């Protein structure tokens, strides 16, 4: 089968791919040399590179209810090109898509920013239950959304929101939505460029909610798609090449993550914004995805008193670098110190309906204040 990779309605690459295998064999047939600058910034234009890029345009294996979702659509993880044929590789991250050669669809008619989503697929993605859906086009962002937790995109009042549940199955699970909601308040108090989060209950599940921060003008690209090896040192070097604005944003993230004890900052949940009309990186992306922060997995014994909580906190480490406080102290600037001062008397604003227990919330609040004092060398 022959396919065409497009940005908007501009054809960029024509390729053939075998469809009867989990590892399609790719052959590049044609490239648009005049528009080479508009190829995805994370695409290496070789058969293997295109294969890697295409894998990112299908639902990940660790996504909640992935097998139920695909089965109801007559699809299978072992046939990725069949998934792409149905969802056209459309994403809410950017304006690239993949169509079968000869398909006359236009981006205006199928893109996920402007056109309705399938509510049936949203419910399937979130609950694992629903009716079978068999059609030549499945208009849904669920096929290109990453992450393990149950989640789905919903269009409400003309805006697009991500609804995301928490972990399940044990006494210390399910707190991720609270962490998203409260961490966003800390970011706001500091003046950190981060996405606001709300709380809502949908399908009987407590969810964090946030508005989509991409559109047809600006795309999001995770830093892990641009820097594939070398760890945080390589990321910093990449940011330094892009300028002070990016370095400052990286440092701000490290300080913020130290305050909230974010144990799940990884190379997929921070990155850059790309101007879709020029295909150039224009700014750091806002921070998001803070569910694994503010001691969300601490068991009941850790909340007995401050000493028990601090003993638990001592066991927490960042995902991709050495330690929270030491790393943050090393990048502190006068501007970041000023942001931390806003936390010295920080108080959470309670949600009107959904909140952590009062004792737990106040203990988290005191730890936020204390971690700010430690970073400011007041302790």
Language model: regions and residue ranges:
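Phosphate/dinucleotide-binding and metal-coordinating scaffold of catalytic cores
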Residues: 1-255, 259-261, 273-379
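Conserved protein-kinase catalytic-loop segment immediately C-terminal to the catalytic Asp
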Residues: 266, 271-273
